[in-house]
Amino acid sequence: MSRLVTTSALAFVLSFGGTACAKNDDAPWQEDLNVFLEVLHAEHDNPYFHTPRADFELAIADYRAALPGLSRAERITGFARIVAMVGDGHTWMPMYRLPFDGLPPGPGFASLPIRFELFDDGLYVVGASHAQADLLGTRVTGFGDVPAEEAVARVMELLPQDATNFAREFVAEWLMQVELLEALGLAAGDKVTLSLERGGESRTADLAALDAGAMYNWVFSMDDGPMGQQDWQTAAEQQPFWLQAFDGHSRIAELEGATYLQFTEIRDGEDQTFAEMVRAAVTQAEARDEPALIIDLRRCLGGDGTLNEGLVSALEESDALNRDGRLMVLTSRSTHSAAVMLVSALEQRTAARFVGQATADRPNHYGETNIFVTPNSALPIIHASEYYQ
C-alpha cells in the first residue's frame, strides 16, 4: 500500500477554500462525478470486476437524475455508494478526515458522543463520554424505527462491497456520523434515537452530535474518545496489550512463552530499517530456551509490500522458528493491503499458524492507495490502481 495524490487532485487541495453547493445546483456534483470516473477508468486496472458495467452505469444514471433534489449529505452518501460498487478494499470514500497532511477534511460530518463496535452477535456501545456512560456495554437494536441489522446493511453499501471484512471493521465508525445517519433515514435532524438492550431489558436514548471540532482517531483506536478529551469511559475494564499505544510503528516485547513482534505499518523507521527490525525480533526469539515468535498484524493496515521479503526470508531461514508450533501470526479485519500480502507469503513459505479473524482483503486483490480529491465538493476518494496476487 502506498499513498499517491494525483496532480489534479493536489491542485484542488491547494486551492480548496470550502465550496458550498445549493441544493438545486447539481452541476458541481455532476462535474465531480465526471472527473472521478475519468480518473477511475484511467488508473484502476478493472473497475468492473465486482459490479457489471451495465449495473454500474445504471446506478450512475439514477444518481445523476436524483441529484437536484438531494441534500448535501444525501449527495455524499449517494456518491460514496457508487464508489463502493467498484468493490475492492482500496476504492472507497472516507467519511472522516484522513490522517495525511494537505488534504481537505472530507464530508465534515459531526460525530456521536459514543463509539460502536460490530461483533458477531451485534452492534455494541464500547466507548462513551461520562454523560452517556450508562450506555456502555449495551447492544444497539435500532436507529430510530429501523432495526440495527438494516441500519448496518444501509451503511455497508457505502463501504467496499467485495472486501466485506474491511467493511465490517469500519461500518461502526460510519454509524457514528450524524448527517450520514440522517441521509440514510436512520436519524431525524441532528438527534439520533437509539434502541438499546442489556440483560433482557430494553430502553431508548436520544443523542446529540458533538461539536464540529471533536475528532476521533478513526484509524488506530476502536473505543477511545475524541482526541484530547479526558471525559471518556470504555466498556473494557482493561485495555489489552495489543491495543495499547506505543511509540513508532513497531515494537518487540517478551511475553510468557514467546517473543512478541507487532507493527501497525510495514515501513522503515527513522533509526532502523524494517528488515533490521524484524531480523532483531527473529534473533531475539531464536535465543529463547524454547524459541517462539508471535507476529501480531491485527492493527496493521498495510504499508510498503516490497519490504515483506525481509521478514519472510528471515523466518524461512530460521531452523528454530520455522517449524510447527514455534511461529504464530495474529490477524483481524484490520489486517489490510500489504499486510495481507505478508500473510499470504508467510502461509506459502513458512510453518506459521494463523489465529484470529479473516483479513480485510482477499489474498488476490486490487491495491495501492491513490487519493483523488473532487474539484468542487473537495471530497478525498481513495482508489486502487494495481492488481496483486
PLM feature spans:
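N-terminal hydrophobic alpha-helix used for membrane targeting or insertion
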Residues: T6-T7, A285
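Hydrophobic alpha-helical membrane context
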Residues: S15, F100-G102, N308
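A generic, residue-level signal for flexible/boundary positions that often mark functional hotspots
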Residues: S8-L10, E201, E368
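Bacterial N-terminal signal peptides
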Residues: T7-G17
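Conserved acidic, small-residue-rich alpha-beta core segments centered on
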Residues: A287-I294, R298-Q389
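Flexible, low-complexity junctional segments that flank or bridge functional domains
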Residues: A22-A292, R299, R323, V373
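Short, intrinsically disordered, charge-balanced linker/junction segments flanking boundaries
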Residues: F16-A22, Y387-Q389
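Positively charged n-region of N-terminal signal peptides that target proteins for export
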Residues: M1-V5
